[in-house]
From Swiss-Prot:
It is found in: Cytoplasm. It comes from Shewanella oneidensis (strain ATCC 700550 / JCM 31522 / CIP 106686 / LMG 19005 / NCIMB 14063 / MR-1). Residues 1-260 are annotated as: tRNA (mnm(5)s(2)U34)-methyltransferase. Residues 282-699 are annotated as: FAD-dependent cmnm(5)s(2)U34 oxidoreductase. Disulfide bonds: none annotated. This is tRNA 5-methylaminomethyl-2-thiouridine biosynthesis bifunctional protein MnmC. In the N-terminal section; belongs to the methyltransferase superfamily. tRNA (mnm(5)s(2)U34)-methyltransferase family. InterPro entries: FAD-dep_OxRdtase (IPR006076), FAD/NAD-bd_sf (IPR036188), SAM-dependent_MTases_sf (IPR029063), tRNA_MAMT_biosynth_bifunc_MnmC (IPR023032), tRNA_S-uridine_synth_MnmC_C (IPR017610). One of its GO terms (molecular function) is flavin adenine dinucleotide binding.
Length: 699
């Protein structure tokens, strides 16, 4: 059973407010939109005629009512049917976040899609992707990765400053919508220039002369167009003449170097993946599966080495796992990352499920994913936890699509069993079967690229020479590979190159409970002291224990009792708790790897020995503390070249894993990232050491 609360009442903005924030552009007719699309495509001619360009990146300044965006996506999809186009990444920078409910309201009330009915399927796809009113980048992926949309919501200056520059695939073109053109300050334009190709086009709708002049001082050659021009028939004669200024281009280069130097302590890959050479991955769980999928969407081949006989036999092997964001009272980088990641994972589940339903299981080749977006209801279980939850609820004006407070009566209606206490409800959350989720990702990856899986292949050692990385099992040697990713969960620290990573194993036992009596009515995931899922195939999942550095992975009767005790403590005097029967001793035990700061690890593998060697060298002269901090800030941190880490997903891997994998895939192929610099710094596997060194503290 699924909880289906009516949440539209939680949204606060009505249509007059929305149309004021997201106004319709002067380009209203289909003829004008077609001409604008032709002009934008015409300006990309130089890029599209290059030998096999893999990706075209385009920026849009402002969302407006979204019609220009929908129209260009449709135009690109139509062209792609007859032309060999590269993949498309559209990055929309918008200061006012908007959610899927408001987008639908905006499009319905304005009747925009009635005037342009061919755009309805794209609009539906965006609405189904459930964008939220949150700060940061939300990546939406369509057409098996052929088209991606980054919704970069938040303060425009901050968003641009924190965007990493992508050398291989910079922004090739900007479309400036008129309602946000007045915000194009010199500082903002220089940041746009930093992120752009040196010959990027700068197209504005009725740009003011002052804005055009400002853009020119930052190295752009602005092309301003009017509604009258787009209504005419001479669109092919309009051309954007790129006038390059060596001094201004040098200023851009210096700005990029300055930004990169400022973030040098978070290293990025020194070499770009080649589609002709596979990337090696050691793993077999959710992280490695989604890395393979994200790479495959980029036509990048990969080879998985898995010690088990199938996917999802480690921490990803549970029958059900909850998916919802981790929120903090401060809504800091951790909280914002988990909101972005949770929504991305939710979209992955929906897309893979749709792929599995397009035909029979055999015909589609994608495993169906058992899941239910039934929501997650979080409640306190003692005075301290209740205070903590209240602080989270009251400290931020959370978007209703992320979470909202409910009273005891509403909690009972959502759960469809007795809760009798207030809580925090995550309406887009739910549960998913982790191992099916992993298998579906690899199934889809195999349709898009050359993907190989070597099962029953335990890699016992890795080594590197001038040609690359080699993987050694008991009887074979694989390689060389230019790039190797360690995504092997509980075995992440088994190699000499990764043994000093600051990450800890925690045993978790999940109890399997038969669905019966009142308990069978549970319609949402409960999260208190432990969690309880709705029934799936006649069983509920109850868990989980949390034991550091456990000596074994055998069934533990005491942990089974502790799981029951957590529900008894969380919901005392509720009759349905008596329906929880653990007597069958049915459970599953796994190990999740946890970091102290709860962020996953994603990025270049740190050379910890070299970090310590440099640290000890600098310790000799403590009088130069400021210079030492500057050294660690601006000097690329030591890494094992070509080796990468993807792990430490902890208890929230279903939420965090797919986005971490997407980000690593973008790094490996040098494509624009869906995360900003502050978040990348938090994810870096070297962060525990560099955090101290940047503050001048002892290791």
């Amino acid at each position: 059973m699924t909880a289906k609360p009516h949440i539209s009442c939680q949204f606060k903005r009505d249509y007059p407010q929305l149309i004021n924030l997201y106004p319709t552009c002067t380009i209203a007719t289909q003829h004008s939109l077609d001409n604008l699309n032709r002009l934008r495509h015409q300006c990309l001619t130089a890029l599209l005629t290059q030998p096999s360009p893999h990706l075209c990146v385009m920026g849009q300044w402002g969302l407006g009512d979204g019609i220009e965006l929908l129209s260009f996506i449709h135009y690109w999809q139509t062209l792609a049917k007859t032309q060999n186009l590269p993949r498309l990444l559209l990055k929309v920078f918008e200061p006012n976040p908007i959610n899927y409910y408001e987008l639908k309201l905006l499009w319905d009330q304005s009747q925009s899609l009635i005037l342009h009915p061919h755009l309805q399927p794209i609009a539906n796809a965006i609405i189904e992707a459930k964008p939220a009113r949150i700060i940061g980048c939300q990546r939406l992926i369509f057409d098996d990765g052929r088209i991606s949309l980054d919704l970069d919501f938040g303060d425009l200056q901050t968003m641009l400053v924190n965007q990493p520059h992508c050398g291989t695939y910079p922004i090739q073109q900007w479309l400036i919508l008129p309602h946000l053109a007045p915000q194009l300050s010199r500082k903002i334009l220089w940041q746009m220039a930093r992120l752009s190709a040196d010959d990027a086009h700068f197209i504005g709708v009725e740009l003011a002369e002052t804005t055009q002049n400002l853009a020119k001082t930052c190295g752009f050659s602005p092309l301003t167009i009017t509604a009258d021009m787009l209504c005419g028939e001479q669109i092919d004669s309009i051309a954007s003449q790129i006038v390059t200024d060596d001094i201004l281009l040098h200023e851009r280069k210096l700005l990029r170097q300055q930004a990169n130097n400022h973030q040098a302590f978070t290293p990025r890959p020194s070499q770009v993946a080649s589609t002709k050479q596979p990337i090696a991955i050691i793993g077999g769980g959710l992280a490695s599966a989604h890395l393979m999928l994200s790479l495959a969407e980029r036509e990048q081949s990969s080879i998985l080495f898995c010690k088990d006989n199938d996917l999802g036999q480690g921490a990803s092997g549970n029958r059900q796992g909850a998916i919802y964001p981790l929120l903090t009272p401060e809504n800091d980088e951790l909280s914002r990352f988990f909101q972005q990641a949770f929504l991305f994972s939710r979209r992955r589940i929906a897309a893979l499920s749709l792929a599995s339903m397009k035909g029979s299981d055999v015909a589609s080749g994608v495993m169906p994913i058992s899941h239910d977006f039934c929501g997650v209801l979080q409640t306190g279980h003692d005075e301290r936890s209740q205070q903590r939850l209240d602080k989270i609820i009251q400290s931020q004006d959370w978007p209703a699509e992320i979470a909202y407070a409910v009273d005891a009566s509403e909690a009972n209606k959502i759960a469809k069993i007795g809760i009798d206490k207030a809580g925090f409800y995550y309406p887009l959350g739910g549960w998913v079967c982790p191992f099916e989720y992993a298998k579906a990702a690899v199934d889809k990856a195999s349709q898009l690229a050359n993907v190989q899986c070597h099962f029953n292949t335990e890699i016992t050692e890795i080594e590197r020479d001038a040609k690359g990385w080699y993987l050694l099992s008991q009887d074979q040697r694989f390689g060389p590979f230019r790039q190797l990713v360690l995504a092997n969960g509980a075995q992440l620290t088994q190699f000499s190159a990764s043994e000093r990573l600051q990450i800890s194993p925690f045993r978790g036992q999940v109890s399997h409970i038969p669905s019966q009596f009142q308990l069978s009515q549970l319609a949402t995931v409960l999260c208190a002291n432990g969690y309880l899922t709705p029934s799936h195939q006649g069983l509920h999942c109850l868990g989980a224990s949390y034991v550091k550095a456990a000596e074994h992975l055998d069934f533990c009767p005491l942990e089974q009792l502790e799981n029951l005790g957590k529900m008894q403590q969380s919901y005392p005097n509720q009759d349905w708790v008596e329906d929880i029967d653990i007597s069958a001793n049915s459970a599953r035990v796994g190990v999740r790897m946890v970091t102290r700061d709860h962020f996953p690890m994603m990025g270049c593998a740190p050379d910890v020995n070299e970090i310590w060697a440099r640290y000890e060298q600098h310790q000799i002269n403590q009088q130069q503390a400021e210079q030492i901090r500057h050294y660690w800030q601006t000097t690329p941190a030591p890494i094992h070249d070509g080796l990468y880490i993807l792990g430490g997903l902890g208890s929230r891997g279903l939420s965090s894993g797919p986005l971490a994998a997407e980000c690593l895939a973008a790094q490996l192929t040098d494509e624009p990232l869906p995360l900003d610099w502050p978040t990348l710094n938090k994810l870096s596997p070297n962060r525990m050491w560099l955090r101290k060194l940047l503050k001048g503290k002892a290791l």
